[in-house]
Amino acid sequence: SSNNSDLGGNTQTDYPDFDISQIELAKAALRNVESRGGGGYTARGPVVKKGSNKGDRAVGAYQVMPKNIPSWTREHVGKEMTVQEFLNDPQAQDIVVENELAKNFEKYGKIEDAISVWFTGRPLKKAKKANASDGSIGVPEYLSRWSEEFDTLVEKDK
């Protein structure tokens, strides 16, 4: 498969062979990037300093922006949840994130785009062009962190 590191030691971030059956591993890798050591399912991120989410704090194991919770829980869990209900429900967090990732993977055809959309709201090429970042890291670094986690999980899963 193409998930090997290249000679420069850089993490491979291109997954042409990614299959929808690996979406759970993709989700687990995302959880590791977003909240490892940071409080897991009840985590609250730092206050966003700029951009469309200014003043807000991402929540949960996957750092979901609160404004997305009502519509995403309605769509994927079957009932609208408040931020607090969402924080108290690890299963709802897993369901929402897995379905959002799958939806964006199906929409764009590449897992890298689905991960980029998660981080920036945009597919990879657009995010790179816009120099999208969360104030501390940009999308290439985020994708690289995700890839490292994903590759490790894929190895363990064999």
Q: Model regions: which residues?
A:
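Non-catalytic cell-wall polysaccharide-engagement segments
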Residues: 1-55, 67-95, 99-158
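N-terminal carbohydrate-binding/catalytic regions of secreted carbohydrate-active enzymes
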Residues: 64
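Acceptor-substrate binding/catalytic loop of class I
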Residues: 61
